[in-house]
């Protein structure tokens, strides 16, 4: 059954892929520092619920503890496989080269980091380490290209554990070339020095953070001058008719899928609600600018169901 499902997902991804990209937009709008609509400084939203800020982190952790083992399959089912094309577009937009060091926040199971490392290896300027046999032993001839790495950062250890398994199957470790490592922590308090990374990505994760403004400030802090911030996130569909159809699917179908595949309807209901609470495209542009980033732009994918926001530390 799962093989048939995966074949269907791949077919839908291919057939719909030509309609993926809809618009590129540069926007500067009024600031909305409390996009959740919650006015109390001690409160925030958890889906459509209002909760204490100190409680949200553990509540989000519980959600991803519950869905970690089925997360990748659910992404395929919920998006009909299109999330793979969205993630490919994120990496194509970044276009990393050898010598790049990525911080992949909310990187969970490694989807973005693996694409990043694969892209590095296709660069004409990439030359891998070579194992040379020598009397039954072996020595490693170091690559002449600049070292590259990805650091997957996530608040949820269960998601990281799933990612590590996938990384080993792909041959990516902290000793591979290029390399990957896995760090658990809070994106509002990154355990990295200033000016450490060339690029920072966050994919379908920033909407789950308690203090998005602080997450953006931390992103700015750890990027090197000239570094790039990229965020792939579900957004707001501008067309009213399409938005209505999307809402019907999201609220009535996705939770049922969650129940059938992972046995957890409530977690997927939260994920749908969290999408609706996330700021619209133009408001998020202003939030990124307020964190210090320049040349902030976004482009909508698949009619605005999600968008890629970009900014530079200049």
Curated annotation (Swiss-Prot):
One of its GO terms (cellular component) is extrinsic component of mitochondrial inner membrane. Its main location: mitochondrion. It is found in: Mitochondrion inner membrane. GO terms for molecular function: 2-methoxy-6-polyprenyl-1,4-benzoquinol methyltransferase activity. The keyword Nuclease does not apply. InterPro entries: SAM-dependent_MTases_sf, UbiE/COQ5_MeTrFase, UbiE/COQ5_MeTrFase_CS. Component of a multi-subunit COQ enzyme complex. This is 2-methoxy-6-polyprenyl-1,4-benzoquinol methylase, mitochondrial. It comes from the Eukaryota. The gene is coq5. S-adenosyl-L-methionine binds at residues 109, 154, 186-187, 203. It comes from Dictyostelium discoideum (Social amoeba). It is a peripheral membrane protein. Its EC number is 2.1.1.201. Methyltransferase required for the conversion of 2-polyprenyl-6-methoxy-1,4-benzoquinol (DDMQH2) to 2-polyprenyl-3-methyl-6-methoxy-1,4-benzoquinol (DMQH2). Gene3D superfamilies: Vaccinia Virus protein VP39 (3.40.50.150). Belongs to the class I-like SAM-binding methyltransferase superfamily. MenG/UbiE family.
């Amino acid at each position: 059954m799962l093989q048939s499902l995966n074949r269907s997902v791949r077919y839908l991804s291919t057939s719909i892929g030509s309609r993926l990209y809809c618009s590129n937009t540069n926007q500067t709008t009024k600031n909305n520092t409390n996009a959740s609509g919650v006015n109390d400084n001690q409160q925030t939203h958890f889906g459509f619920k209002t909760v204490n800020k100190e409680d949200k982190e553990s509540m989000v952790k519980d959600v991803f503890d519950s869905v970690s083992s089925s997360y990748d399959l659910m992404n395929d089912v919920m998006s009909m496989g299109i999330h793979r094309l969205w993630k490919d577009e994120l990496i194509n937009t970044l276009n990393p080269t050898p010598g790049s060091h990525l911080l992949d926040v909310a990187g969970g199971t490694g989807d973005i980091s693996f694409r990043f490392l694969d892209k590095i290896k296709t660069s004409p300027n990439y030359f891998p380490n070579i194992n040379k046999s020598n009397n039954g032993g072996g020595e490693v001839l170091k690559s002449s290209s600049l070292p590259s790495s990805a650091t997957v950062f996530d608040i949820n250890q269960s998601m990281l554990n799933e990612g590590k398994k996938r990384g080993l199957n792909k041959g990516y470790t902290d000793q591979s070339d290029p390399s990957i490592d896995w760090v658990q922590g809070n994106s509002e308090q990154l355990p990295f020095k200033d000016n450490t990374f060339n690029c920072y990505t966050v994919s379908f994760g920033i909407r789950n953070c308690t203090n998005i403004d602080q997450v953006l400030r931390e992103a700015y802090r750890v990027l090197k001058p000239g570094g790039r911030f990229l965020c792939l996130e579900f957004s707001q569909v501008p067309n009213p008719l399409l938005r209505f159809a999307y809402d019907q699917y999201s609220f009535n179908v996705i939770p049922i899928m969650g129940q059938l595949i992972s046995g957890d309807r409530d977690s997927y209901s939260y994920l749908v609600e969290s999408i609706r609470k996330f700021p619209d495209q133009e408001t998020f542009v202003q939030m990124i600018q307020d964190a210090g980033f320049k040349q902030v732009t976004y482009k909508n994918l698949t009619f605005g169901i999600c968008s890629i926001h970009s900014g530079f530390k200049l």
